[in-house]
């Protein structure tokens, strides 16, 4: 009999030996009991290493700055959320009542965190080489199409250049909330941007990631104005 998890395992290309790991990876902190944030922490580091290693060997003549920008593009929340939607992760997430009601299963940050948690779970269930193979299979088309150059600028840089080009004031970022233990925090940042009515919210596991997430959202809103 095919369970929902069997279906998800086929989508991600990996069958778990320890089913508890995949269930934990899909459990958001809003749900009761254990949740996926420790797995997310682990998966974030593994993903960054695997992508950095691939870019280093794929682009032997590219400098550190361009490689950093390409990696940032590939591991940012928006890209991870795209992967989550490709796997239809929203159908499998375990959320608390409040997140369910507010549509958390569609939220970029929750989908991105779950993808990182799955990476952490695959690593714990197997080994470094297996998780590398899985990540590279997910990223194959993106790695084949990405190129070094200006298009890889991070969202904060692109937002600043967008505003400067229109002679608008620079964005103002303010940390409005920090929650969680020191090793596992979530930062909430508000970004005030000329041309956007309300401050834009960004969340991330560091201030920098939260600011980048807010800048990405601001760019999307400005492009629709």
UniProtKB/Swiss-Prot annotation:
Residues 5-127 form the RNase III domain. It is found in: Cytoplasm. Its EC number is 3.1.26.3. GO terms for molecular function: double-stranded RNA binding; metal ion binding; ribonuclease III activity; rRNA binding. SUPFAM superfamilies: dsRNA-binding domain-like (SSF54768), RNase III domain-like (SSF69065). Mg(2+) binds at residues 40, 113, 116. It catalyses: Endonucleolytic cleavage to 5'-phosphomonoester. One of its GO terms (biological process) is regulation of gene expression. InterPro entries: dsRBD_dom (IPR014720), RNase_III (IPR011907), RNase_III_dom (IPR000999), RNase_III_sf (IPR036389). Residues 154-224 form the DRBM domain. PROSITE patterns: DS_RBD, RNASE_3_1, RNASE_3_2. The active site is at residues 44, 116. The keyword rRNA-binding applies. PANTHER family: RIBONUCLEASE 3, RIBONUCLEASE III. Digests double-stranded RNA. Involved in the processing of primary rRNA transcript to yield the immediate precursors to the large and small rRNAs (23S and 16S). Processes some mRNAs, and tRNAs when they are encoded in the rRNA operon. Processes pre-crRNA and tracrRNA of type II CRISPR loci if present in the organism. NCBIfam families: RNaseIII. This is Ribonuclease 3. It comes from Vibrio atlanticus (strain LGP32) (Vibrio splendidus (strain Mel32)). The lineage of its organism: Bacteria, Pseudomonadati, Pseudomonadota, Gammaproteobacteria, Vibrionales.
């Amino acid at each position: 009999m095919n369970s929902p998890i069997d279906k998800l395992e086929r989508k991600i290309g990996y069958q778990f030996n320890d089913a508890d790991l995949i269930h934990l990876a899909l459990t958001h902190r809003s749900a009761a009991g254990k949740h996926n944030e420790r797995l997310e922490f682990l998966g974030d580091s593994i993903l960054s290493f695997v992508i950095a290693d691939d870019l280093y060997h794929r682009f032997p003549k590219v400098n550190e700055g361009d490689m950093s920008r390409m990696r940032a593009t590939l591991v940012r929340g928006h890209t991870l959320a795209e992967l989550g939607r490709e796997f239809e992760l929203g159908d499998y997430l375990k959320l608390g009542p409040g997140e369910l009601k507010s549509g958390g299963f569609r939220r970029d940050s929750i989908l991105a965190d779950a993808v990182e948690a799955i990476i952490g779970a695959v690593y714990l269930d197997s080994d470094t080489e297996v998780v590398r193979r899985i990540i590279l299979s997910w990223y194959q088309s993106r790695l084949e199409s990405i190129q070094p150059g200006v298009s890889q600028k991070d969202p904060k840089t692109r937002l600043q250049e967008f505003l400067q080009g229109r002679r608008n004031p620079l964005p103002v970022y303010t940390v409005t909330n920090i929650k969680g233990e020191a090793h596992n925090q979530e930062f909430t940042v508000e970004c005030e941007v000329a041309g956007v009515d309300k401050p834009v919210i960004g969340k991330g596991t560091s201030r920098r990631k939260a600011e980048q997430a807010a800048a990405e959202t601001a760019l999307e809103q400005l492009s629709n104005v």
